[in-house]
Regions:
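Short beta-strand/loop motif that positions the catalytic acidic residue
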Residues: 301, 307-309, 313
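Acidic catalytic loop of the alpha/beta-hydrolase fold
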Residues: 255, 312-316
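C-terminal catalytic histidine-bearing segment of alpha/beta-hydrolase fold enzymes
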Residues: 1-4, 11-15, 25, 32-35, ...
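N-terminal cap/lid segment of alpha/beta-hydrolase-fold proteins
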Residues: 4, 9-40, 92-143
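Short beta-strand element of the alpha/beta-hydrolase
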Residues: 143-154
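Hydrolase active-site cap/lid region
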Residues: 88, 92-103, 232-287
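Catalytic nucleophile-loop/oxyanion-hole region of alpha/beta-hydrolase
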Residues: 159-168, 174, 179-218, 237, ...
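Primarily recognizes the serine-hydrolase "nucleophile elbow" in alpha/beta-hydrolase
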Residues: 42, 200-263
Length: 380
């Protein structure tokens, strides 16, 4: 138990350890209760404590502390998070609820399951269609609901539109239409195929806005990991005033930087992923690396952006989001960067965990802010 708890403190060195680290960091508070129960059982035995029992108590105490540490860090961040977000997005955008709820940690919310409509978006190359799952907004406004375009992760060579679908249901229940799109995958399809499919998905949604009940002038691109790279790469292109904002969780935004700073033999073979996605190393496919790196596309007209990243992410270095946040600040682009020191890649697998709650609070604030009012057309 203590070894498992240590994953809340250390960077996970292997894929299995990474998956266990998600459980330790975002569900560990449940196991901390188990540690407390075991301590009670040891003490209830009575008699002399002895070195063996003392060692067991120490280990259980350490385990409980480590397992509670993410929740403690989240609580500390939650105390200042509303004010941080108000400073960027305004008073009216921040929810009145607490950024972190103890009740939600131990009694997760039930997700209201909504109908899902699957549609087909024709590929740019005319060689078939790609499925799109659409979640209609609950009680959407008469003029059409804002639409969140959900772009899945998976290292550009895997994943699909059904990833973490509970988030789509929750957003739709809050009054946002959600479109979980598909895109062609590497290595069969290299850049810019995936980006073209994102653009095609948005075009489809805009052309069918009336029947879908969405506002064609209020889109938000939301991607996790590889999907976050696509969200910023596509969302930061000029001439798209209908893109009100971009959300990226634990994503790489500068693939030149990723190539230079990826260790050999890491938890993820990022060199292989980039080669098959972009067509080679940077010296072989420099244009693709440039086009796919939103970091180099930032201007004062870049859409408002929300970035979320875990400090213990062993798959995508948190410096990717940190650097993009600094770049956005240099150009005066409204943005927020939520850093979660304990969190690993895909921490939001548990939307009611310490990281999931803080990210959800920041997301709700962001969506309220960027879908209100009117964004002026970009002129870059």
């Amino acid at each position: 138990l203590t070894g498992f708890a240590a994953l809340t403190w250390a960077h996970p060195p292997t894929p299995p350890a990474w998956k266990l680290a998600i459980l330790a960091g975002e569900y560990g508070h449940f196991l901390a209760l188990l540690s407390g129960l075991l301590v009670s059982l040891v003490l209830a035995q009575g008699g002399a404590l002895g070195w063996n029992r003392f060692a067991v108590l120490v280990l259980l105490g350490v385990a409980a502390g480590l397992l509670l540490w993410p929740a403690v860090q989240a609580w500390r961040i939650s105390r200042g998070l509303p004010d941080r977000l108000r400073a960027v997005w305004g008073v009216g955008a921040v929810p009145s609820r607490a950024a972190l709820s103890l009740g939600r940690l131990f009694l997760p919310r039930l997700t209201r399951r909504l109908p899902v409509e699957t549609r087909e978006v024709l590929r740019v190359d005319g060689a078939g269609g790609l499925p799109l799952d659409f979640y209609r907004a609950v009680d959407g406004p008469r003029g059409g609901a804002p639409c969140v375009v959900m772009i899945h992760g998976g290292g550009w060579d895997g994943g699909d539109r059904t990833q973490l679908a509970d988030a789509n249901h929750r957003l739709a229940a809050r009054g946002y239409a959600v479109a979980a799109i598909s895109y062609r995958l590497a290595p069969q399809h290299r850049w810019p195929a995936a980006a073209e499919d994102v653009v095609a998905g948005i075009a489809y949604l805009r052309s069918h806005a009336a029947e879908l009940g969405i506002d064609p002038e209020r889109f938000i691109l939301f991607g996790r990991s590889a999907g976050g790279q696509l969200a910023t790469a596509v969302g930061y292109r000029p001439g798209q005033p209908f893109i009100r904002g971009v959300v990226a969780y634990y994503a790489p935004h500068d693939l030149h930087f990723a190539w230079r700073n990826t260790p050999e033999g890491g938890i993820l073979d990022f060199f292989k992923l980039m080669r098959q996605y972009l067509g080679g190393a940077p010296e072989e496919a420099s244009r693709a690396y440039d086009e796919a790196s939103a970091y180099h596309a930032v201007t004062p007209q870049t859409p408002p952006t929300l970035l979320v990243h875990g400090g213990k992410d062993s798959l995508v270095w948190f410096r990717q989001s940190e650097r993009l946040a600094a770049r956005l600040a240099e150009h005066g682009v409204p943005h927020a960067y939520l850093a979660l020191p304990w969190a690993v890649h895909a921490f939001d697998f548990n939307p009611d965990g310490p990281g999931g709650q803080l990210a959800d609070f920041a997301l709700e604030t962001f969506l309220t802010a960027v879908t209100s009012g009117r964004r002026e057309p970009a002129s870059r």
